[in-house]
């Protein structure tokens, strides 16, 4: 075997022996050849590998492991490598104890790098109760493979489907539903959508399973509302086999983009929602609604948020990015008034319905952006004691931070699914008079690189 020793001119298919030095935040091993970094899947710190160069850029390259010369004592060796190839479990080859250590270090390092301080109090990670089979929702792509309708997951950074039957991190009954539908659709020769020819009907199978009630919702993402022959019979067989299915819907997505759901839903069976519990409150969950995918860990997350808030019976609180109301409704019994806002009208209607379902009379929800709603509330004399915010991965707009500071709460509680944008927002909050008090990482996503956190900011 030939080794290219010209370290200044790497080429595709070169092979080097090297030590893995670190992990990226996405779980790739970091190898340096003459200070030039390569990122390598399925490689852990401390391992020595023969690395096959796949791609070389100006500042870094990518490689794969051709051979392990030595392996880490923290490696999980029995893992199905398809979980790494697809990203289903991009940390699945690392022992759970080490995953937790890495995620804590990730939060600390990002805060130090972005916010410029090394003394932020980052508490130990709240570990997961279950480290596999925990997800209550799955979005499964469907393609024709060798003439057969096939379910699985895309190879990372591609739309090439890798067939998967056991998805490892989602509830086993979700897997069972997906396989049942795959087999039934094969029997009737149903055609999956083909991105190249733009022909075929079925694009994705989306399954939710409520953690506490066991109710299930099936959404078939399709190109047309016209049902192919015998699909209704498949649905009949499905609900006979899985009696806890309470909703079956079509979602119409005739577009050519990579987004999963279209705007139109058509009910085929049952109700247009399922019901679950969160911290002893009842919630109706619609097909497009956001709902945390790991219910037991989400309950820990929210309890931590309420503890950080230091809630008092007379408090007025704002639940920004309120969604279907889970954060505000779950704490409504502990405070005097909950105000929530959300830009998605259907989510606001869900929040109002969920408040009624729980017989709450101290909640109020409006449609609109926080940047517009909060100044309006301030002009109406509403003065919150605590503001809760749970934004998407992009974090907060600067306008939100300004509007929140104008409300002058004693404390702001921030729930984040992206440490990088959270760290950026720490700097912005501190510029507007709110200092970071403490950070609590919570592992909602075992076997993956993702980490959730709760943080509190106190007014200077």
Swiss-Prot record:
Alphabetical list of InterPro entries matching this protein: MeTrfase_TrmA_AS (IPR030390), MeTrfase_TrmA_CS (IPR030391), NA-bd_OB-fold (IPR012340), SAM-dependent_MTases_sf (IPR029063), TRAM_dom (IPR002792), U5_MeTrfase_fam (IPR010280)
Record-listed S-adenosyl-L-methionine binding positions: 292, 321, 342, 390
Gene3D superfamilies per the UniProt record, alphabetical: 2.40.50.1070, Nucleic acid-binding proteins, Vaccinia Virus protein VP39
Superkingdom of the source species: Bacteria
TRAM domain: residues covered: 9-67
One GO BP annotation of this record: rRNA base methylation
Coiled coil (UniProt feature): none
GO molecular function, one term: rRNA (uridine-C5-)-methyltransferase activity
Residues forming the catalytic site: 417 (nucleophile)
Keywords attached to this entry: Methyltransferase, S-adenosyl-L-methionine, Transferase
SS bond partners: none
EC id: 2.1.1.-
Record carries keyword Methyltransferase: yes
Family of the protein in this entry: Belongs to the class I-like SAM-binding methyltransferase superfamily. RNA M5U methyltransferase family.
Protein known as: Uncharacterized RNA methyltransferase YljE
Lineage: Bacteria, Bacillati, Bacillota, Bacilli, Lactobacillales
Gene: yljE
């Amino acid at each position: 075997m030939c080794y290219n020793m010209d370290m200044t001119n790497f080429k595709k298919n070169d092979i080097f022996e090297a030590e893995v030095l670190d992990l990226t935040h996405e779980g790739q091993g970091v190898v340096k050849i003459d200070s030039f970094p390569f990122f390598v899947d399925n490689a852990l710190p401390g391992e020595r590998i023969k690395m096959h160069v796949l791609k070389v850029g100006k500042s870094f390259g990518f490689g794969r492991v051709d051979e392990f010369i030595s392996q880490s004592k923290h490696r999980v060796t029995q893992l199905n490598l398809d979980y790494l190839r697809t990203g289903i479990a991009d940390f699945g080859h690392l022992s759970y104890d080490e995953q937790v250590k890495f995620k804590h270090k990730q939060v600390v390092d990002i805060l130090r790098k972005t916010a410029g301080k090394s003394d932020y109090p980052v508490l130990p990670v709240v570990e997961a109760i279950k480290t596999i089979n925990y997800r209550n929702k799955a979005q499964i792509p469907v393609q024709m493979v060798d003439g057969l309708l096939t379910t699985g997951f895309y190879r990372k950074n591609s739309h090439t489907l890798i067939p998967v039957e056991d998805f490892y991190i989602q509830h086993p009954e979700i897997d069972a539903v997906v396989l049942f539908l795959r087999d039934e659709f094969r029997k009737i020769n149903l055609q999956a959508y083909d991105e190249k020819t733009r022909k075929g009907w079925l694009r994705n199978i989306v399954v939710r399973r409520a953690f506490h009630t066991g109710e299930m919702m099936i959404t078939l993402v399709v190109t047309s509302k016209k049902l192919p022959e015998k699909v209704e019979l498949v649905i009949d067989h499905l609900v006979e086999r899985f009696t806890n299915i309470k909703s079956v819907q079509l979602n119409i997505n005739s577009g050519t983009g990579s987004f999963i759901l279209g705007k139109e839903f058509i009910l085929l069976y049952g109700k247009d929602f399922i019901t679950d519990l969160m911290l002893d409150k009842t919630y109706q969950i619609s097909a497009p609604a956001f709902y945390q995918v790991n219910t037991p860990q989400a309950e820990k997350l929210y309890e931590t948020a309420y503890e950080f808030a230091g809630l008092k019976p007379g408090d007025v609180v704002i639940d920004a990015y309120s969604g279907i109301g889970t954060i505000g409704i779950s704490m409504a019994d502990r405070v005097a008034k909950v105000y929530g806002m959300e830009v998605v009208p259907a989510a606001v209607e869900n929040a109002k319905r969920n408040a009624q379902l729980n017989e709450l009379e101290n909640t109020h929800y409006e449609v609109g952006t926080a940047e517009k709603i909060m100044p309006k509330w301030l002009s109406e004399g509403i003065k919150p004691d605590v503001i809760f915010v749970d934004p998407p991965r992009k974090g907060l707009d600067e306008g939100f931070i300004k509007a929140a500071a104008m409300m002058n709460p004693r404390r702001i509680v921030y729930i984040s699914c992206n440490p990088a944008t959270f760290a950026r927002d720490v700097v912005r909050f501190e510029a507007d008079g709110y200092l970071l008090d403490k950070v609590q990482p919570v592992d909602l996503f075992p076997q993956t690189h993702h980490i959730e956190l709760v943080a509190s900011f106190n007014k200077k």
